[in-house]
Amino acid sequence: MKIAMLAPLWKTVPPQKYGGTELVASLITEELVKLGHEVTLFACGGSNTSAKLVEVIDRPMYDILGGFKFDAIQFYDFMEVKMAFDAAKAGDFDIIHNHMGLAIAALGNISPVPMITTNHSSLPPDFEPLSRLASDCNYISISDSQRSMAPYLNYIATVYHGIRTDQIEFKADSGDYLLFLATMSEQKGVDRAIEIAKRTGMKMKMAGNITDEKYFETIKPLIDGEQISYIGEVDLQ
């Protein structure tokens, strides 16, 4: 099968450090190639893949903009979709797998070939009006619980995020501390994780880049460097 993978342009695929969606898109792409499919990955420059790589821009948008600025990336998102749709019209693809988010999902009905969208994030408050217009497009949920946020969408399957077991070693015995691995932002629930650590009396290490400086300042007094410590952004190693 000839498959187009549409990855976000924020980070390289796979990411050097933070980039959950980019990591999952990379894992799926590499496994599809191993299965013998003809895969084309649309992503930013600097990405590394065994599939055919189409560089939509020469470097990550996060580096170009100096952070996440969603209004500024919309033009490049639609440029990526246009490139994929044009290639699909030329017969290059049998299917398109969208990892770019919910706005792109709404274009599913005008795609030259079948398109499926995996939603890797929570649903924004203003998603419902748009999504109802595209409720008959094809979606993959990352958990059955996620479906409850928009039960009216046309879900094809639930596919949980996977990991490379050769990179993340399983240990039967638990450690002596909690680990919080996510961006330092309100939507990730950092404050709730700290509350759990405080209530259980366990130490907690927090790792991830700070995407909301204002919010981070509100939790900073709770980080004492002993029970609660912040170690910054980390990679898979």
Model-derived segments and spans:
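Catalytic cores of nucleotide-sugar-dependent glycosyltransferases that transfer UDP/GDP/TDP-activated
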Residues: 1-237
